[in-house]
Curated annotation (Swiss-Prot):
Record keywords: Ribonucleoprotein, Ribosomal protein, RNA-binding, rRNA-binding
An annotated Gene Ontology molecular function: transferase activity
Encoding gene per record: rplB
Protein name in the entry: Large ribosomal subunit protein uL2
Organism the protein comes from: Sinorhizobium fredii (strain NBRC 101917 / NGR234)
Record note on quaternary structure: Part of the 50S ribosomal subunit. Forms a bridge to the 30S subunit in the 70S ribosome.
Family according to the record: Belongs to the universal ribosomal protein uL2 family.
Length: 278
């Protein structure tokens, strides 16, 4: 899908660049594959703000997307591609041979009428097909990769993302991720072939603040323009630079400070995403 720009009738129209979604289905989603989604506004069950700068936005219906792909050896036909307001990628409605329907993440070059299949054995290497990493040819571009067998895909699910299978070692698959990280994943974990749809998502320009508000994003206020009671960078006469290394509102270092603390999975990371930056 291409990018779409508009005649400069207003300042926001002049700057607006969006993804042309003319090829997507224009109707409502399948009702049995949807759930209600209540707006949280960044609040928890106590009503306290736990995530700042969220709230408002258009009402959404949640689409139940099948990230597990455990319906083995039943061929499915793609009925249509749809927009999903809950993610940056597009989704595909699949009609299986046994009459069941499901939404899956749509990879690039998947179109209505295409056949897809998931299996615990080797199947054709074509977009949308799913199989264990141990059967996928080295060098393949993949997405929706499981980190634990049966848990469902967790890696490479966002628009335009993918991982590359670069090798195998003692029952483990070696993946290169978008971030530059090289990681070991068990060979029995499932992955889908292809890169995720909507690669132009990274090139859009909202054109105006209102388009962020429609998504439920509120203005992100900088610490240096707050009062001292609200932020460590706050206060001062006139404009100040904050006067210290950048910190969060709670005084923790930010802007590049590494926060990863899961030591138990360090052994699965062959190459850190930070190594290439040094």
């Amino acid at each position: 899908m291409a990018l779409k720009s508009f005649n400069p009738t207003t300042p926001s129209q002049r700057q607006l660049v969006i993804v042309d979604r003319a090829g997507l289905y224009k109707g409502k989603p399948v009702k049995t594959l949807t759930e209600g989604l209540s707006s949280k506004g960044g609040r928890n069950n106590l009503g306290r703000i736990t995530v700042r700068f969220q709230g408002g936005g258009h009402k959404r219906t949640y689409r139940l997307v099948d990230f597990k792909r455990r319906k083995f050896d039943v061929e499915g036909t793609v009925e249509r591609l749809e927009y999903d307001p809950n993610r940056t990628a597009f989704i595909a409605l699949v009609n299986y041979a046994d009459g069941e329907q499901a939404y899956i993440l749509a990879p690039q070059r998947l179109a209505a009428g295409d056949k897809v299949i998931a299996s615990d054995k080797a199947v054709d290497v074509k977009p949308g097909n799913t199989m264990p990493l141990q059967f996928i040819p080295v060098g393949s571009i993949i997405h929706n990769v499981e980190m634990k067998p049966g848990k469902g895909g967790q890696i490479a699910r966002s628009a335009g993302t993918y991982a590359q299978l670069v090798g195998r070692d003692q029952g483990m698959a070696i993946l290169r991720l978008n971030s530059g990280e090289q990681r070991l994943v068990h060979g029995s974990c499932l992955a889908s072939i292809g890169a995720v749809s909507n690669p132009d998502h990274g090139n859009i320009n909202d054109g105006k603040a209102g388009r962020s508000r429609w998504r439920g994003k509120r203005p992100h206020v900088r610490g240096v323009v707050m009062n001292p009671v609200d932020h460590p960078h706050g206060g001062g006469e006139g404009r100040t630079s904050g006067g210290r290394h950048p910190v969060t509102p709670w005084g923790k270092p930010t802007k590049g400070k590494r926060t990863r603390s899961n030591k138990s999975t360090d052994k699965f990371i062959m190459r850190s995403r930070h190594q290439r930056k040094k």
